[in-house]
Amino acid sequence: MSDKLKQFKWLIVLFLFLLAIPSYFTYNYFRQSSTLKEAFEKNERIEVLHRLMASEKYAPDIRKAGYVVPPDEAIRLDGVIYPLEIEGDLHLKISPPKKDAKDFQLFFITQVNEKQTHVAFILDKNLNLIDSSYSQQNDNGKREIISVSQSEEAYLLKSVQSEIDAFMKKMYQTLYG
């Protein structure tokens, strides 16, 4: 009788252990999802970008919202979504921010002085410009750094900010209805 009771106790312990494993993963999944929603609601753009781009988990949702991400195989290979493309007026290409980053980078091509110009911006969490770089091909076919007027840079920054804000709103709507 005591052996059967001992066996029964071991079965209960084993059952509880096996139940704990999927419970842990389910809890983690929903905790991550709620963390993303909190980041959206607190307007923490860098945290939102990090969580959206950190794996292939949100790639189908990003595609559903109408944005461009690499194929799932490339995301699995790279470990992140790189780049996230917002096909607006500027066709932004956003690099995935690192965890706990204070800034993020984006790239786009535009026309400055009627020449194709490659632009790189580094923005902070409030989408303020930290640094920028502008380059054009010279007559020899080499890229050279150029400077742009303050008004041109302000115009480009405002366009970038509005496209990122529109992306954030659309992604929130797509994910949380």
Predicted regions and their residues:
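Short, Lys/Arg-rich N-terminal segment immediately upstream of the first membrane anchor
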Residues: 1-7
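Short, flexible coil/linker elements and helix-boundary hinge sites characteristic
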Residues: 8, 34, 43, 55-57, ...
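Hydrophobic membrane-insertion alpha-helices, especially the h-region
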Residues: 10-25
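Intrinsically disordered, low-complexity segments enriched in glycine/proline and serine/threonine
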Residues: 7-12, 47, 102, 114
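Extracytoplasmic electrostatic interaction patches
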Residues: 82-177
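N-terminal export/targeting and maturation segments
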Residues: 22-100
